[in-house]
């Protein structure tokens, strides 16, 4: 409640979202495509046509139209996360190394071992290594926001808004909240 959507959605034709990119279609682009599809459905109050993103070599991402009520619900969830993030830095970043395993449905959030493997894999993209000297964890803003703590070790119970999820890793919980729905759409489940 109380949120007004303003501006425009790039690549909106009035009936569907159509976009071409000179790069390969990446997971981050699919997430943006999904959010654009949510915005269009919520703003128009109608199920828009498919959102189509075509990349180099003909790889493509096609998202079916989204029901406006579902779009409003999903956007409300994202807005609530943004409000929480204003009070407390949330340990999540939309990098392809974070999103790829989710979009490819390699993570089963209801299986503890699968989540642990996912967190370990993503952790490696966050910290510097000999072959990858620059990492998100080195950025001054990241260092300041988390006061030297590993964002992968923060638990849901440390924030009132997520306390109901207990000892679950907050990073994994946020990944599921933010990316789980787009993964469902890409797999045809939603």
Please name every model-derived segment.
Residues 1-190:
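Structural signature of nuclease core domains in nucleic-acid processing machines
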